[in-house]
Amino acid sequence: MKNLRLCLLSAVAIMAALTLSSCNNKEQMKDSPAAGTPRAIIHTNYGDMTVEFWPDVAPRTVDNFIKLSREKFYDGSAFHRVIKGFMIQGGCPNSKVGARGAPGTGGPGYMVKGEFNNRAHVKGVLSMARASDPDSAGSQFFVCHGDASFLNNKYTAFGKLVSGEEVLNKIANIRCVGMEGSTPTERVEITSIELVEAK
């Protein structure tokens, strides 16, 4: 009887260990790109940044970003708002040379419903900018330059930087002016966005 009890306890312990191992593998795989996971290379006059999208948590947002990139909507726009240690923001058509309207006030002419999720806003995370209305995102996006956990579950995180952190740092270190101290003194232009697939 005693031996049977020990065997049962051993079996339970092994099952628990396997379950934990399985859970850990799932957690690790969650951050690994699946075959064909879409990526984009944001080409700028400061260098390239490659981002990997998260269609599993923000499908509409990812589709919208890809659509606008294919339409060359972002080409010639700029990172018009830069706050070191917080984020760099771009994607506004009003930031293009010769455009009417103030940078930061433009969009594609429609809004995308928010897809708030459990992905943390940490350095390198790609997220959508918006107005006070949670469903007012359009084309403007930002790349976190530091921890911005106060944005978690309030802004749509939809991807992360997988290369080009040195470019992010270079842009974030540009001297800025203005009331908020976020207007770059040098133009950081998005020359194009190239869509690729993870291998």
What residue ranges belong to the model's regions?
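Cyclophilin-like peptidyl-prolyl cis-trans isomerases
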Residues: 4-10, 18-199
